[in-house]
Regions:
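His/Met- and acidic-residue-enriched segments that coordinate or traffic transition-metal cofactors
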Residues: 2-9, 13-174
Length: 174
């Protein structure tokens, strides 16, 4: 079950490591933002339908709502700026890690599903925050793109804290 988590986290670690060698362009950052949010939307939809714990289901629904909102903001901004999101190794790794996570979650049910979903959310949000802080914000050249990243950061912090609280209530401490 840890494989998709490792793949998604590895993509974000690579992003941080690559930032030292070559910072991502604004077009690549836009693609990373949309992809990272879509990965969490897909997992959230599954949690809404498959979660056995009411709090896990509600958290999944919140992830779908919040991350869909961020994607709408990102798409509106890149449209306004006439920037075409550029696929890159980080987005490819995020997509494959996200698909693998959903595939593995689909095999689980009950409390095992709830724990696996929440564990992934804790790890994923921590790594997304690290990428936002260490790579995406520092690398963004466009002031509006940088502003978007700064403005959505508190929601990622709140999601991480919420997921940690759920993790604790489910008896998991990672």
């Amino acid at each position: 079950m840890k494989t998709p988590i490792v793949a998604a986290i590895a993509a974000l670690f690579l992003l941080g490591a690559n930032a030292q060698a070559q910072a991502p362009s604004d077009a690549q950052i836009a693609s990373i933002v949309v992809t990272a949010n879509q990965v969490d939307i897909d997992a959230g939809k599954l949690a809404e339908s498959k979660g056995s714990n009411a709090q896990v289901k509600a958290f999944g629904k919140q992830m779908v709502t919040d991350h869909s909102g961020v994607n709408k903001q990102a798409v509106a901004l890149v449209t306004k700026l006439k920037v075409t999101p550029e696929d890159n190794p980080t987005t490819q790794s995020l997509k494959s890690g996200g698909a693998e996570n959903v595939k593995n979650l689909e095999k689980l049910s009950g409390a095992a599903f709830d724990r696996a979903y929440v564990d992934h959310e804790v790890a994923y949000h921590q790594q997304v925050l690290d990428a936002i802080d260490k790579t995406l914000i520092p690398s963004a050249q466009n002031a509006e793109l940088k502003s978007l990243l700064v403005s959505v950061r508190p929601a990622f912090v709140a999601h991480l804290e919420h997921a940690k609280g759920l993790q604790s209530s489910l008896g998991q401490k990672n």
